[in-house]
């Protein structure tokens, strides 16, 4: 069996159906990534206070009215195909419950919002949102709302809660709301391709691994999440923004860039900045998913005063905002191919998200400490994230900085110090300091790190990866220069003692397969192999990769050879462009196991079907984001495991 059953007929409650937008496709795929490997929160959650004299019945009526107005609140998605269905307003009961609490204070709100966000939402069968009313002394004091990212983004959630708050106050709210289905026809492929080209160019021309050598725990795993709230920094930020005639959001990004440059000595790096894509008036009341990232080029002059830094960030942001509409499925595949070709995973130094309006619907914070700031941090053994994520919001009387960072980039103490240091910089600037950009890092790079043209690389980790190949007996890695074809550009040279049958191609493929799994590595530019038992006088094998202009080696193709490889190859062929011809399930020889999934023209929108086909064949063990990365199919197939057998508990056996 090499194909899945066709989707079931739409239920009678469906009023219209259609494809997911390009942005939705990413979040639809993202929901299949195991939670410890995800960075974006799913579901999103926020709250608003209940203005008196609104009652619980008023809250239910307002939520029902919003459900009728916003089709996104009654949209479900197909589990295997990028399709969405809009249902009638009364298709399901309102997903609202009530909780009695002793007091609706900051601590209670924080815990209750986190608890609601932790409850999974099934966007395939249920409304993609839920609400909870907090009741204190018999009266509703706050409404919490959580929503699935596949139909609502952060800006959309703020629009929704703001309209809920306005309706509870008796204010009029806009009647027109654009659904993502209404924007599918307006997606322009040529504009998307231009944005994707810009992204790939920026990724390839900026260093990767900027933060890694200058902090974190050596070999650290897991990640830290923290939130810093400051009332003092609110006023300081206002003063700095007026001083430099820049938006508060741009000033915070400039401060973050200044901090990275001060810490690392890098003056040119990439920031991935989230934009709302809601410039048109018709979209400002839409709660649907539209936000995407743009590549903001950070280019700072050593010694430049902060005013010059802010101006350069404003200019770079304006240039980047043209590239806010692209196809995540196509860009992720193109980046996987590029990273595998270049031998290094390209990662922006910063991911920055901000809300451009104050959320004045929030419950007022009554527990702000006397010094005007408060911080909490939590650490988890999740998969480390490869960049520094900072979310900024500016609400009534305080700013909030949410930080997520891998322990190998910043340890817990360094993560806690980051937002406090940013607020300290704002205070200095507000007091009139110039705060020039240092020419050199505050501390040198950690031992074992080398700055290649592509970015920072850990020589120790590259050596460990080489030695993890079963045919490599020993290996050393060091920078070297070969003037034969690369203009004298330094690159990594690997010297390895290997088993007699191991070739440079074998070792190179092994390194490429580890790019997405081991942070801080890149493929050597040259391999010098000495087979064990080499006869005296015989030269070692040499091999060059594409570094500094040399010709990219042609990795030989390889058909599937094991049961797991054949199962994966059959699934790839079935979901690939054109599909698999009938009757060829047992002959997927055209699939090259030495290439990654993107090399076969398969993008992330096909991965849910691919995983379902593997499950149908009796295999599991590969995460969806691993399939979308740089690893070869042969490497992925080695991780497949048989599905666990289910114990029979009586009754008829399942077919």
Regions found by a protein language model. Give the residues of each.
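A short, small/polar-residue-rich loop/turn motif at beta-strand boundaries
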Residues: 2-15, 51-68, 83-125, 307-317, ...
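A short N-terminal helical cap/helix-turn-helix that marks the beginning
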Residues: 76-77, 164, 168-178, 202-211, ...
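Extended, hydrophobic beta-loop-alpha segments that form or line the acyl/peptidyl-thioester binding
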Residues: 70, 74, 267-274, 380-442, ...
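Active-site-proximal acidic secondary-structure segment that organizes catalysis
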Residues: 18, 130-180, 415-428
